From Swiss-Prot:
GO terms for molecular function: structural constituent of ribosome. Keywords: Ribonucleoprotein, Ribosomal protein. SUPFAM superfamilies: Prokaryotic ribosomal protein L17. One of its GO terms (cellular component) is cytosolic large ribosomal subunit. Belongs to the bacterial ribosomal protein bL17 family. It comes from the Bacteria. Part of the 50S ribosomal subunit. Contacts protein L32. GO terms for biological process: translation. This is Large ribosomal subunit protein bL17. The gene is rplQ. Coiled coil: none annotated.
Amino acid sequence: MPGQRKLGRATDQRKAILKNLTTALFVSGRIETTEARAKEVKNIAEKLITLAIKEADNFTSKQVKVSAAKVDSKGKKLTDTKTSKNGKKYFVVEREQKTDMVSVDNASRLHARRLIMNWVYRPTTADGKNINITDKLFDEIAPKYKDKKGGYTRIYKLGPRRGDAAEMVILELV
């Protein structure tokens, strides 16, 4: 008996379906799908959440020098006029140096982040902004379940789907 359900699809199609469903679950918190797909997504989501919980606090902070363009009150870059050796004038963007505190992942957290990225897509909002699911897992979802040991998702049965009578369910984060 195989370790995972085949879902009547080729391997690449099956993985794409599971990635889409897993991403949708983490973005919206709940999905409506068939029972077989929900059981597979539940296994994947539980493992990813457990991984995020274990590695949630495994990072360090360090100071980094950052160079950025100076901007005026309207948000436009400030420029300065310079003269070249040949006597031609050109514009140079004025820059400012500052130091920022940046969090840097340790090796095990970086590995966990890459494993999570294997199972989710990079969705966008209606405005076109990217949603970073790995950051959402580490910063929002993992702290919520920090004291729990499993059981992060639940399945509600809805009944058969009209047309092919497939058993429909709602999979949601608890």
